[in-house]
């Protein structure tokens, strides 16, 4: 095996290992979602609880997805899965997400009028939805800080730069 190929494999293995770990915050979100939607507190979640928990974590799950998860992980045929199984499924799904695609989805949540830009109005709506009581002056300052082309709005390229720390 050539030295170049060997070092490429080492780099690839390192990248893969790095990518295969959740942050502590992500781990806590998974635990919180399970506990929140385990409505009967029996330490297992059924079809409906699983579907809602997955959606709360940002997954657009279809009925077939939820049924497959239950089929694959419900070893005792109870119609439920445990936290350990839920954690395994959700961890895999989170690690398979494309970060760039997730950033574009987030941009679309702000850009509800499909203008291709985040305006003061868009930012005000999101702040209000998140329970943030911010003045227009504060919101304008946020836009100005990241508005590299000076048009008074945040375009997709500027948003990606914000989210990836390239600003």
UniProtKB/Swiss-Prot annotation:
The UniProt entry, under SUPFAM superfamilies, shows: EF-hand
Its encoding gene is what? CETN3
Spell out the subcellular localization from the entry: Cytoplasm, Cytoskeleton, Microtubule organizing center, Centrosome; Nucleus, Nucleolus; Nucleus envelope; Nucleus, Nuclear pore complex
User: What's in the keyword line of the UniProt record?
Assistant: Calcium, Cell cycle, Cell division, Cytoplasm, Cytoskeleton, Metal-binding, Mitosis, mRNA transport, Nuclear pore complex, Nucleus, Phosphoprotein, Protein transport, Repeat, Translocation, Transport
GO MF entries: calcium ion binding; G-protein beta/gamma-subunit complex binding; microtubule binding
Q: Name one Pfam family in it.
A: EF-hand_7
Q: What is the lineage of its organism?
A: Eukaryota, Metazoa, Chordata, Craniata, Vertebrata
* Residues with PTM Phosphoserine: 135
CDD domains linked:
EFh
Q: Which Gene3D superfamilies did the record assign? A: EF-hand
Start and end of every EF-hand domain? Answer: 25-60, 61-96, 98-133, 134-167
State its role: Plays a fundamental role in microtubule-organizing center structure and function.
Task: Identify the GO cellular component terms for this protein.
Answer: centriole; centrosome; ciliary basal body; cytoplasm; microtubule organizing center; nuclear pore nuclear basket; nucleolus; photoreceptor connecting cilium
How is this protein organized at the quaternary level?
Answer: Monomer. Component of the nuclear pore complex (NPC)-associated TREX-2 complex (transcription and export complex 2), composed of at least GANP, 2 copies of ENY2, PCID2, SEM1/DSS1, and either centrin CETN2 or centrin CETN3. The TREX-2 complex also associates with ALYREF/ALY and with the nucleoporin NUP153. Interacts with USP49.
Question: Which family, according to UniProt?
Answer: Belongs to the centrin family.
Presence of keyword Transmembrane helix? no
Which PROSITE patterns does its entry note? EF_HAND_1, EF_HAND_2
- Which SMART domains does UniProt cross-reference here? EFh
Q: Name one GO biological process term.
A: centrosome cycle
Chain residues that bind Ca(2+): 147, 149, 151, 153, 158
Q: What is this protein called?
A: Centrin-3
């Amino acid at each position: 095996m050539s030295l170049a190929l060997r070092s490429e494999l080492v780099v690839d293995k390192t990248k893969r290992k790095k990518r295969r770990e959740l942050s502590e915050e992500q781990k806590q979100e998974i635990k919180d979602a399970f506990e929140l939607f385990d409505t009967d507190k029996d330490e297992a979640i059924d079809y409906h609880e699983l579907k809602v928990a997955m959606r709360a974590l940002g997954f657009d799950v279809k009925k077939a997805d939820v049924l497959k998860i239950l089929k694959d992980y419900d070893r005792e045929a109870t119609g439920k899965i445990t936290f350990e199984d839920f954690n395994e499924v959700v961890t895999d799904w989170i690690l398979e997400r494309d970060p760039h695609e997730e950033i574009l989805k987030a941009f679309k949540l702000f850009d509800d009028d499909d203008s291709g830009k985040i305006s003061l109005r868009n930012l005000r709506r999101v702040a209000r939805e998140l329970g943030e009581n911010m003045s227009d002056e504060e919101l304008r300052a946020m836009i100005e800080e990241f508005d590299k082309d000076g048009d008074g709005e945040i375009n997709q390229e500027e948003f990606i730069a914000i989210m990836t720390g390239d600003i």
